[in-house]
Amino acid sequence: MSSTQAPVEPPKRRRIGVLTSGGDAPGMNGAVRAVVRMAIYSDCEAYAVFEGYEGLVHGGHMIRQLHWEDVRGWLSKGGTLIGSARSMAFRERAGRLKAAKNMVLRGIDALVVCGGDGSLTGADVFRSEWPGLLEELVKNGELTEEQIEPYKVLNIVGLVGSIDNDMSGTDATIGCYSSLTRICDAVDDVFDTAFSHQRGFVIEVMGRHCGWLALMSAISTGADWLFIPEMPPRDGWEDDMCSIITKNRKERGKRRTIVIVAEGAQDRSLNKISSSTVKDILTQRLGLDTRVTVLGHTQRGGPACAYDRWLSTLQGVEAVRAVLDMKPDSPSPVITIRENKIMRTPLVDAVQETKHVAKLIHDKDFEAAMRLRDAEFKEYHFAYRNTATPDHPKMILPQDKRMRIAIIHVGAPAGGMNQATRAAVGYCLTRGHTPLAIHNGFPGLCRHHDDQPVGSVREVKWLESDAWVNEGGSDIGTNRSLPSEDFETTAMCFEKYKFDALFVVGGFEAFTAVSQLRQARDKYPAFKIPMVVLPATISNNVPGTEYSLGSDTCLNTLIDFCDAIRQSASSSRRRVFVIETQGGKSGYIATTAGLAVGATAVYIPEEGIDIKMLSNDIDFLRENFARDKGANRAGKLILRNECASSTYTTQVIADIFKEEAKGRFESRSAVPGHFQQGGKPSPMDRIRALRMAVKCMLHLENYAGKSRDEIAADPMSAAVIGIKGSQVLFSAMGGEDGLEATETDWARRRPKTEFWLELQNYVNVLSGRASAGKPLWSCYESKHFPSCCRLYNTDLSIDIDPSALTSS
């Protein structure tokens, strides 16, 4: 089709355009890939608009059709491969007139725009003007009535791609967690030199007029002080900052000082607070050897983290579904996320609310600005302020409300355990509680509680826990042993050390431990105290939550491993790697990692493995490699959960593939093993650890002063904190409707309903495997869980033309 002459007849398939605009953000390529492949899967054609709105204005070769194989390998690439630009021409009506003409000439009547609030505002203006633009094009003689007839309605769907995370109505924007990862990596590296020389560092981070990056990096790195636009410091902040830093260094022995400054930081009179100003105050007033580090555009670069790959993929798929669902009078949606739930929000409302926040800040109504950011933002700010330093005299509780709170880790190590403990300790000290760490789990409690000179039950000091801010694993020690191994001694220790509450951090073993303690209350009154479980396991298999601490760290570690393996596979061209993942009898890690790395197939325990499945996948791989014809990035990855099959092990599958390939491709196996538990926790695990640990402490505080029988009678006195859909909730473990009875598959050590199962559909669809004889969801457990997913309410059974799918 000519770029200057539109056909009279509309194209046989609907054409969906996709563009990236404004500042680039990691994850944009994942969104484009998902839009392109979901469009093709849905029997549509996908067109990329290169260089953002500038490409729409210029048309011609800047609007090109993308095929299935064109977006192969894009998930691991940073930035945006279709380019981005801040178009001045598109801001003018004359530019939008050219853009409308170019879209009609290409037969495109739907546009998915990935960008910030400015880009999405431009998209909505474009849609509102669309009928008038077409009329003007006909009036000017540039197009005919016959040409514009099929394109009277323009559908716009927004994806928020921005490292700033400044869009209202969503918890996260595409790219924000990758940017946060860059910041945390940089500050973690600064720790060493700051500690060595007892220096102070003032770190300036991006974010424009939004303080999300600054706040989350302050939480993730344990910064001593923070400046964000939404909550400027009160007058006299210079004295407050110097007082806190002096106490942290001289009274508590902290050797390093970190201050995080958002680039839009200001005081309550809207005067800018620069990083150099803060540095001068620390140097002149405290005599502190201070350095300024401006991270700049390194925060935008590099590959997307696991969360941004996952988010961009699911939102890209949802954007295509939204296009196909839209009616002529439907408002333009923007695809958002609340906790773990993908949602559609009216684009106009989200943009207006975002602009309203900026106006409130300008009008000095900072409390209202904080409320409008989102519920999470204000909670995180509260949690940060109450854990960064224990100096909050107004927060101290009266003596009769103070508690002795025991903290224990149970299960395998997971990223975020230390950060949850640090947050709990910080909050306890702020409120006047006594935090007591039980070292080395229940065996440590029973066997070594009275060891000399140091027992396993020890009060935690602020400086000790502050050092855990970026440490992986478990500094107080963890294991899988349960209290049922010695109830007598466990109860005796509870009495001896006068535990008023128990905070348990861990995986399915932690859940089981609290269940056992709850059920033993009648025999052992010492267990009639409030107990709460904060799920922390890479397997993400704890009932009562859709997210466990450590799972994000594991995913990031695993995708780094897979990216390196894919490079090897692609360099050898015709090679398949079968990679074994951990996760026990839950396929969460394998499935979400498969989605994040673009795996060809994922084998999980919920589905099992049989010879027919392997035969279909061998045929699929053989056809894929035959079509590649020397194409680049031709390596394939298959992920297999360690418990997917006792017969078809990782090595056996690799050997079967190699044998059946008959020389057409090679196969290798790779087992990352305990490497998947990760090193330093990811920023997401760090910040969620803080928020959820503080919530747990608030929950335990509700029982202060109550009798043992009152506590035991309350089902919520033994609870699990978790993310369910778009909410953070506490769920009771006992009772007829409790987690133990209704949501726990004890035999398989996982929840009865696993929210992520529908992700397997997306892995198959986006790899092309769904057209290769493999049913979208053939798991035997689907009989038991026909509607297991509140998050991805998706029907993917669309009639497609198999020839539209080429290689994965």
Curated annotation (Swiss-Prot):
Region annotation C-terminal regulatory PFK domain 2: where it falls in the sequence: 404-808
Cofactor names: Mg(2+)
Magnesium listed as a keyword: yes
GO molecular function, one term: ATP binding
Catalytic class of the enzyme: transferase
PROSITE patterns: PHOSPHOFRUCTOKINASE
Region feature (Disordered): 1-21
Alphabetical keyword list: Allosteric enzyme, ATP-binding, Cytoplasm, Glycolysis, Kinase, Magnesium, Metal-binding, Nucleotide-binding, Transferase
Active site: 164 (proton acceptor)
EC number of the protein: 2.7.1.11
Pathway the protein contributes to: Carbohydrate degradation; glycolysis; D-glyceraldehyde 3-phosphate and glycerone phosphate from D-glucose: step 3/4
Residue ranges crossing the lipid bilayer per the database entry: none
GO BP term, pick one: fructose 1,6-bisphosphate metabolic process
Residues bound to substrate: 162-164, 199, 206-208, 263, 291, 297-300
UniProt-annotated binding residues for beta-D-fructose 2,6-bisphosphate: 480, 537-541, 575, 582-584, 642, 668, 674-677, 749
Major location (coarse): cytoplasm
UniProt-annotated stretches for the region Interdomain linker: 390-403
Ranges where the record places region N-terminal catalytic PFK domain 1: 1-389
InterPro entries in alphabetical order: 6-Pfructokinase_euk, ATP_PFK, Phosphofructokinase_CS, Phosphofructokinase_dom, PKF_sf
GO cellular component: 6-phosphofructokinase complex; mitochondrion
Family the entry assigns: Belongs to the phosphofructokinase type A (PFKA) family. ATP-dependent PFK group I subfamily. Eukaryotic two domain clade 'E' sub-subfamily.
Entries under PANTHER family matching the protein: ATP-DEPENDENT 6-PHOSPHOFRUCTOKINASE, PHOSPHOFRUCTOKINASE
Name under which the protein is recorded: ATP-dependent 6-phosphofructokinase
Organism: Aspergillus fumigatus (strain ATCC MYA-4609 / CBS 101355 / FGSC A1100 / Af293)
Encoding gene, per UniProt annotation: pfkA
